[in-house]
């Protein structure tokens, strides 16, 4: 099933935006949580990306994410709307939780604009929201492979004649449980209260 849940964000020009597509096959409401249930469980991608310090990062084995709830979002730092809104909402939701719950959850931002989003650029941008947020980048083929493993639709950046750079990406947040499997995702319209309700349940493996 194709869901229009993202935006083709523009930067460097008039900042125009339009719809993007994310494929959530057989998505439906998930029992007990406010996210949507994925049609089939999704394993963490085997593709290794690069963190903001330039070190290889494997979502499956890195000590920052192994055994923790891991929320993965694809976007870019020049995004004028959905990316900063999503990061701010996740930060607000985490801030509302007890410290013990927060420590069991990690947010991972994967850049879909690797030519402009260098490690330091991503790090400065994420630090506006939460210094614990993990930023990843890499070559476009590796980023696309990573996204494809999650059934998340992204497209390479396109520079228009007027200098505007359009980057089409999904608004989906994929939630991996501590066992390394994603069964739930969050789409446009998810509120801070929705995240705050679900994250402790995910951390306890109650999905």
Predicted regions, residues:
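Structural microenvironment flanking redox-active thiols in thiol-disulfide oxidoreductases
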Residues: 85-146
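Second-shell loop/turn segments in exported
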Residues: 76-80, 110-112, 132-133, 184
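Short loop/turn microsegments at loop-to-beta-strand junctions
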Residues: 44-45, 70, 170-172
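N-terminal targeting signals for export/organelle localization
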Residues: 1-50, 206-207
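Generic structural signal for well-ordered beta-strand positions
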Residues: 57-58, 183
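Short, ordered coil/turn segments that flank beta-strands lining enzyme active or ligand-binding pockets
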Residues: 52-53, 178
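Short active-site neighborhood of thiol/selenol oxidoreductases, capturing the structured segment around
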Residues: 60-90
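Thiol/disulfide oxidoreductase modules built on the thioredoxin-like
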Residues: 142-198
């Amino acid at each position: 099933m194709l869901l229009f849940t993202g935006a083709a964000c523009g930067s460097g020009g008039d900042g125009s935006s339009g719809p993007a597509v994310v494929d959530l096959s057989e998505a439906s409401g998930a029992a007990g949580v406010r996210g949507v249930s994925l049609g089939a469980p999704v394993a963490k991608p085997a593709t290794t990306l690069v963190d903001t310090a330039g070190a290889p990062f494997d979502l499956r084995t890195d000590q920052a994410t192994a055994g923790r709830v891991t929320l993965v979002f694809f976007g870019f730092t020049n995004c004028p709307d959905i990316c900063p809104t999503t990061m701010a909402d996740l930060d607000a939701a985490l801030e509302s939780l007890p410290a013990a719950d927060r420590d069991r959850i990690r947010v991972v931002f994967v850049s879909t604009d690797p030519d402009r989003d260098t490690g330091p650029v991503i790090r400065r941008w994420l630090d506006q929201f939460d210094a614990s947020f993990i930023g990843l980048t890499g070559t476009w083929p590796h980023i696309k492979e990573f996204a494809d493993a999650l059934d998340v639709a992204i497209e390479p950046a396109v520079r228009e004649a007027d200098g505007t750079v359009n980057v089409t990406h999904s608004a989906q947040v994929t939630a991996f449980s501590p066992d390394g499997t994603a069964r739930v995702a969050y789409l446009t319209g998810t509120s801070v209260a929705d995240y705050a309700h679900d994250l402790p349940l995910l951390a306890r493996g109650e999905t």
